[in-house]
Amino acid sequence: MADAQMQVAPTPTIQMRTEEDLSLPHPSAPEGLPPPPPKETFSKFQQQRQASELRRLYKHIHPELRKNLEEAVAEDLAEVLGSEEPTEGDVQCMRWIFENWRLDAIGDHERPAAREPVSGGNVQATSRKFEEGSFTNSSDQEPEGLRPSGGDVQAARQMFETKPLDALRGQEEATQTTMREPAATGDVQGTRKLFETRPLDRLGSRPSIQEQSPLELRSEIQELKGDVKKTVKLFQTEPLCAIQDAEGTIHEVKAACREEIQSNAVRSARWLFETRPLDAFNQDPSQVRVIRGISLEEGALPDVSATRWIFETQPLDAIREIEVDEKDFQPSPDLIPPGPDVQHQRHLFETCSLDTLKGERETEAEVPPKEEVIPGDVRSTLWLFETKPLDAFRDQVQVGHLQRVGHQEGEGLVTECLPSNGTSVLPLSQGVPQNDGLKGDVKTFKNLFETLPLDSIGQGEPSAYGNINRGQNTDSAEQSQGSDAPVYAMQDSRGQLHALTSVSREQVVGGDVQGYKWMFETQPLDTLGRSPSTIDVVRGITRQEVVAGDVGTTRWLFETQPLEMIHQQEQQKPEEEEGKGPGGPPPELPKKGDVQTIRWLFETYPMSELAEKRESEVTDPVSKAETQSCTWMFGPQSLNPAEGSGEQHLQTSQVPAGDRQTDRHVFETESLPASNQSSGRKPVRYCSRVEIPSGQVSRQKEVFQALEAGKKEVPETTINLGSIPTGSVHKFTWLFENCPMGSLAAESIRGDNLQEEQPKGSAGHGTPERQETAAERTLRTLHATPGILHHGGILMEARGPGELCLAKYVLPSPGQGRPYIRKEELVCGELPRIVRQVLRRTDVDQQGLLVQEDTAGQLQLHPLMLPGPGDPGNIEDMDPELQQLLACGLGVSVSKTGLVMQETGQGLVALTAYSLQPQLTSRAPERSSVQLLASCIDKGDLHSLHSLRWEPPTDPSSGPATEESQRVPPTESIIHVTPLDSTMEMGQLRISGSTPCPPPSRAAGKVVLPNGKPVAQAPLQEARKKRDISHAGQKGKAASGRPEASPLGSGAPDLQEAMQNLRLATAEAQSLHQQVLSRHPQGSDPVATSMPVQDVLQASTPATGVTQGSIRPVAGSEARIPAVPRKLL
């Protein structure tokens, strides 16, 4: 029996060898290798053919070896599933599944589906039973067919909406019921439910059944904190809905969330929409509905309250943005219903006081006034309260009665600019006799002050209750003021002056913070026609706080400057600059007539204190604690900054003067001088830092410049190769994640140009095309075969050791398109552990489905029996096919394995396990992953290695040179060969066979073995010839059916011989594949062509027993190839 098995083992090698010889014959001589065929020849057929050959080799593995492999798989699964304690990845995955699975399906597994068709029933009889409480003899009255489950509110609501009560069981049965029970009533519970949820005008209407809410409730969370109840409801939009932002862009609404917060007397609701751009996918515009508005309908009855949210939608293809004038929307007088004028009533409430709206005007003649109104000028009094401190009225104003403010000669109601203190004084006229006939309507003026701004009150018109003589005095005062009083002006950033017509101040108090906002109303200065001597420019506003006892007074002072002084200052400035000269040293002390000093004095001090400035500096400053002053200076600058290399900085100064302290902060920009270096590529960076310690103002400036050309520098984007040890994981991980495979040559590894390659054509296109993800590709493959996906659910796919891709997908109606992913996330976890956690649920359907893809691309469906809820969930209880699929999901596998959770019609969770073949990817250079490359090498995936390998250019001189070729003389190239050992494993052989070597760029070549002895080119050619002879010898042995003698005896299973035969067959397949895929330049010297490492390995393989005399393996050498040459792909 053992002999028969050993005779059958080499059989696949013979057939594969024969097919390979027929399709790709060996050259007659090693000197004349044919040119490689084009890439199009190696299509998917070739890849499937190689995969089928590997499967056939696996079938003919020795039974003992196959049994050992199955035991190793079972041990791996037992090791993963052995610990009962959940890991961090398990908790994260199960939480993700809990959040994205329907919450209403958890814990209620016997509830029928929401859209399950419900057959009709006798609703009237059922309602009567509920009202009377009689449930006897109910079996004979119930129909024998399928009845809806008890308490199905949705089914009862649908029946009440579509059918009348007397027609639910037919007219005859309704008549008999009425005869037996004259006082037949309806379903009170259902009717009340209808009245609470539906408006009265919609009850019983048939079109209501066709209305579908665009929102579908997925989860509801209620939080109760004290008397505040917060409800968060998560909806999903079906069908597709969109929303339009303020800019007109339309976004798809993926999910909607509504937060309701309800307390004692406050109830608020907020809608949150999760959106994505509408152009990111292709959808039919007729299927998209744009949400135009959300309205809330509330209905109140004596004991019933109803609230309904209504979404007003519009089809996307029906939107026509048309600009319509406002005149088209004017209301027609015929459509205005007769009734109270709401706008007029609203205007009255906004403008009139409450006591005038209660009918006080009609009863004014009957009710005597409560208090006699004292005549007075309300405008002057209000002006006094806004401008004068409270302590100024103690000696001038009488308590109890307001005195009328009169005008003295040459004075008006405006301020006078006095040079002594800069304040405005308006004395009160106490000698004006009171006139009993003059009365002021306080309520009217109060209404005016509450509703109208101060500048809009008619100042030129005489008051209706004022005196005629007083009005004449006001006009004369205004005329005299127009010729003598100065005009205040402000200067903008452009240097232009504007006359001030009104000044208003807003004060904002929030907690302990007070803010002031000044607004100036101006007009052009040239329209006034005034002389410069009567124009004062407002330079700053000073806020002065005076505390006297318990009363605090705030005084705002406008500091002005005559316009003529500004012109003199501008004329003196260039004269002073010319007098200094460019070479003269700057004066240490400010001289008389220094423009900068005078300007600083004008900006910080009022005019009345400039004469006493020097004396105040010599003497000790008198500090008054009860007075604080803070000045904001208006320092307009030109829009075009001065172009000069002078140093600009931040200036902070504190000057005590008299009873005030002024702080001035001048922030100016800092220009970057041009670099005078000749290189031009070294950047110059300036970093300015201002440090202000306690009690002292200092300025420090640090300038960091680029190093000189002769100094050593380490660029930020380069990595020194000498400082990196051999096998640095961080270095090569960075290379594989940031550089394309085609640029991983020795120069890029050395760190000269480690720059990320930009994709070609990205600048020409405005929006790049969206790439299909791996999860979407898997869903598309599963959806192509009917019977696999029948409901939306969760997709779990293994991406690598300890990584899972969880995706929530939505399955549209049949004919509406393919499924799409609503949410996708990459989490940590093991697929077998998650499967075991899912199988512990009580609502899992025991009848599962296993989907496997064959070599032809067809999906094979097999039923899968899952353990029940009561089973412990051991490895032995699972299906063998499921065990093999879970074992593939543990490590790095080429095939895509995963699990699909979806809901059945009975509310159960159906599990579908799948294993798909890897699909063909583009040959364009792309960023690779270290895990993907390691998996391809370990598994022997020739197609993936070929798609990721580096292809040399046609010109051998332009190819990248390795580090070894740079250290040897230019006339030689060294190929390092690691011989095979008899204890080499299959994974190591696949690594050596699938690792091509870059072609040498020199004319001559030699082979250096690990023992350090070079081998000439002729022995290398002899080794290749002997390799062919060894292949022929093996072919003859397999054809004759006489295997070699086993050292263990003919009776024992020869495991060593089976391993050698399998190793030889795999090496043959890989050698043939590498020979065809290797590029050989036409017309070049055959000696200079690239020889794959596989050829030398085959020449040195001791399994053949023929070529051991030419090349001997070195004792103690490693069987695995070092990690550094693996990077030269």
Curated annotation (Swiss-Prot):
The keyword Phosphoprotein applies. It holds the Pfam family Xin. Xin repeats lie at residues 89-104, 121-136, 151-166, 186-201, 226-241, 264-279, 302-317, 340-355, 376-391, 440-455, 511-526, 549-564, 593-608, 625-640, 658-673, 695-710, 727-742. GO terms for biological process: cardiac muscle cell development; heart morphogenesis; myoblast differentiation involved in skeletal muscle regeneration; negative regulation of cell population proliferation; Notch signaling pathway; protein localization; regulation of membrane potential; sarcomere organization. Its main location: other. Disulfide bonds: none annotated. Expressed at intercalated disks in cardiomyocytes of the heart (at protein level). Expressed in myocytes where it localizes to actin filaments prior to differentiation and is then expressed at nonstriated nascent myofibrils and Z-bodies during differentiation (at protein level). Expressed in highly differentiated myocytes at immature or mis-aligned Z-disks (at protein level). Expressed in skeletal muscle. Disruption phenotype: Increase in interstitial fibrosis is evident at 3 months of age and worsens until 14 months of age. Disorganized sarcomere structure, abnormal frequency of adherens junctions and decreased density of the supporting filamentous web leading to greater separation and detachment of intercalated disks at 3 months of age. Cardiomyocytes in culture show conduction defects and defects in atrial depolarization and ventricular repolarization at 3 and 4 months of age. Residues 1-49, 111-151, 459-485, 567-594, 633-661, 753-774, 946-973, 993-1012, 1018-1052 are annotated as: Disordered. Residues 469-483 have a biased composition (Polar residues). GO terms for molecular function: actin binding; filamin binding. The modification Phosphoserine is found at S205, S208, S213, S295, S332, S353. One of its GO terms (cellular component) is intercalated disc. Residues 1-54 are annotated as: Interaction with VASP. Residues 535-636 are annotated as: Interaction with CTNNB1. Protects actin filaments from depolymerization. Required for correct cardiac intercalated disk ultrastructure via maintenance of cell-cell adhesion stability, and as a result maintains cardiac organ morphology, conductance and heart beat rhythm. Required for development of normal skeletal muscle morphology and muscle fiber type composition. Plays a role in regulating muscle satellite cell activation and survival, as a result promotes muscle fiber recovery from injury and fatigue. Interacts (via N-terminus) with CTTN; the interaction promotes CTTN localization to intercalated disks in cardiomyocytes. Interacts with CTNNB1. Interacts with FLNC and VASP. Interacts with F-actin. Xin repeats bind F-actin. Belongs to the Xin family. PANTHER family: XIN (PTHR22591), XIN ACTIN-BINDING REPEAT-CONTAINING PROTEIN 1 (PTHR22591:SF2). This is Xin actin-binding repeat-containing protein 1.
